[in-house]
UniProtKB/Swiss-Prot annotation:
The active site is at K81 (charge relay system), S156 (charge relay system), S180 (acyl-ester intermediate). It comes from Nocardia farcinica (strain IFM 10152). One of its GO terms (biological process) is translation. This is Glutamyl-tRNA(Gln) amidotransferase subunit A. Its EC number is 6.3.5.7. GO terms for molecular function: ATP binding; glutaminyl-tRNA synthase (glutamine-hydrolyzing) activity. It catalyses: L-glutamyl-tRNA(Gln) + L-glutamine + ATP + H2O = L-glutaminyl-tRNA(Gln) + L-glutamate + ADP + phosphate + H(+). PANTHER family: GLUTAMYL-TRNA(GLN) AMIDOTRANSFERASE SUBUNIT A, TRANSAMIDASE. Allows the formation of correctly charged Gln-tRNA(Gln) through the transamidation of misacylated Glu-tRNA(Gln) in organisms which lack glutaminyl-tRNA synthetase. The reaction takes place in the presence of glutamine and ATP through an activated gamma-phospho-Glu-tRNA(Gln). GO terms for cellular component: glutamyl-tRNA(Gln) amidotransferase complex.
Length: 490
């Protein structure tokens, strides 16, 4: 393994911009690493080596001509979750229904990455249409956890997290609907942030649940993640949910936090996200992390968010309802797979045959749940009630932030389980979102930072840090301070 793949993105950027190393060298080193290990891990669905090297060469040429770097991360390659559209690579969402589909336009996030001079190594594996917590729901096979290849890497963005953890990429982009950036980060000992809803454009992000989906940055350090956050965030008039507000100073906050002083910061431990039903090693790691925050000068208090108890059932009504609506567009008429189009079937039959063949079991399950929840006789009883709970959860957050600056919890109640262990028990798998989904329901930012290895099985555990809307910088200050005090993960 080239030592170029072990350096942080910040280190690589500094050395590329100083012309001590070239972007082509760095990109090639990561492509070599992909060729070496991804046959076993299956983190990538598509590798764009030639295009990535062309982008890297363009960065090197610009620097050689005396031009300033296009961004603080210019020349540092990246892995992109296969849910963002790209004109030069297939966008499949890990589904057979979009196998080989080429988008006619780039997502705004893709456009920002290209403008920043960031070579895109390829598109990463995921649960189909971002529905799942293990990356086992991909139509192209599961991704394996680099820490133990018999275990899951989290989901839905397990491909991006596994690529980071295995040194196949120094940076990655994910999406988070109910924890799909943070839970994979936790179980692979990487860093992932779900920004405030509406601060990273969803234009060109294939929708799962539109009121919950949020693209976000992933890295191996808090500073790397902050640098990428500033590249992809910002107002986009093409996204009707985009917020026209300044990007929080997350890089400055990360650098400040690394100094290790949290005096004056109030941290709330959420009572409802600390349960004896959680894995003992997860709780032990979390309690140790809270002790570190106290040692850094933070004031730690317990806070109660009583309606979090209803977060899981509320989420699993809101999200499938939006899925049912969004995925209606895959009708075999406009793009993607088309089955039975031989002139002997009606349009309705072609649509039914295509959806039956093209969608996997979990996607079908959520479409059915959502369609039922939205049906005329049950709308108020199910979907309407879930929206009321969503409002109550947001109010719980508001009351909590009157007392504290940030909230903390374990990222996931469990360490990564064995591949196949929960495939036939979706309810058990849904529980892995227990700690992460409240922030999606409220639209608030949250981050997962590695907090060590579980005493139960030696697998990675994550500390979740949450903040009020548009206070993403608080995540980075606290996360960087904790990261510096915690030291390396074994």
């Amino acid at each position: 393994m080239s030592d170029l793949t072990t350096r942080t993105a910040a280190e690589l950027a500094q050395q590329i911009h100083a012309r001590e190393i070239s972007s082509v060298e760095v990109t090639q080193a990561h492509l070599d690493r992909i060729a070496e290990v991804d046959g076993e891990l299956n983190a990538f669905l598509h590798v764009a080596g030639e295009r990535a090297l062309e982008a890297a060469a363009a960065v090197d040429a610009a620097l050689a001509a005396g031009e300033a770097p296009a961004s603080p991360l210019a020349g540092v390659p990246l892995a992109l979750k296969d849910v963002f559209t790209t004109t030069d690579m297939p966008t499949t969402c890990a589904s057979k229904i979009l196998e080989g589909w080429m988008s006619p336009y780039d997502a705004t996030v893709t456009t920002k990455l290209r403008a920043a001079g960031i070579p895109i190594l390829g598109k990463t594996n995921m649960d189909e249409f971002a529905m799942g917590s293990s990356t086992e729901n991909s139509a192209y096979g599961p991704t394996r956890n680099p820490w133990d290849t018999t275990r899951i890497p989290g989901g839905s963005g397990g491909g991006s997290a596994a690529a980071l953890a295995s040194r196949q990429a120094p940076l990655a982009i994910g999406t988070d609907t109910g924890g799909s950036i943070r839970q994979p980060a936790a179980v692979t000992a990487t860093v992932g942030t779900k920004p405030t809803y509406g601060t990273v454009s969803r234009y060109g992000l294939v929708a799962c649940a539109s009121s919950l989906d949020q693209g976000g940055p992933c890295g191996r350090t808090v500073l790397d993640t902050a640098l990428l956050h500033e590249v992809i965030a910002g107002y986009d008039p093409r996204d009707s949910t985009s917020r026209d507000v300044p990007v929080p100073p997350v890089v400055e906050a990360a650098r400040r936090g690394a100094a290790g002083d949290l005096r004056g910061v109030k941290v709330g431990v959420v009572k409802e996200l600390h349960s004896d039903s959680y894995q003992p090693g997860v709780l032990a790691s979390f309690d140790a992390a809270v002790a570190v925050l106290k040692d850094l000068g933070a004031e730690v208090v317990e806070v109660s968010c009583p309606h979090f108890e209803y977060g899981l059932p509320s989420y699993y009504l809101v999200m499938p309802s939006e899925v049912s609506s969004n995925l209606a567009r895959f009708d075999a008429m406009r793009y993607g797979l088309r089955v039975g189009d031989d002139g002997t079937h009606s349009a309705e039959q072609v649509m039914a045959m295509t959806r039956a063949a093209g969608f996997g079991p979990e996607v079908k399950r959520r479409i059915m749940i959502g369609t039922y929840a939205l049906s005329a006789g049950y709308y108020d009883e199910y979907y309407g009630q879930a929206l009321k709970v969503r409002t109550l959860i947001a109010r719980d957050f508001d009351r909590a932030y009157e007392q504290v600056d940030v909230l903390v919890s374990p990222t996931s109640p469990f360490t990564p389980w064995k591949l196949g262990e929960k495939v036939d028990d979706p309810l058990a798998m849904y529980l892995s979102d227990l700690c992460t989904l409240p922030t999606n329901l409220a639209g608030h930012p949250a981050m997962s930072v590695p907090s060590g290895l579980s005493k139960d099985d030696g697998m990675p555990v994550g500390l979740q840090i949450m903040a009020p809307a548009l206070a993403d910088d608080r995540l980075y200050r606290v996360g960087a301070a904790y990261e510096a005090a915690r030291g390396p993960i074994a």
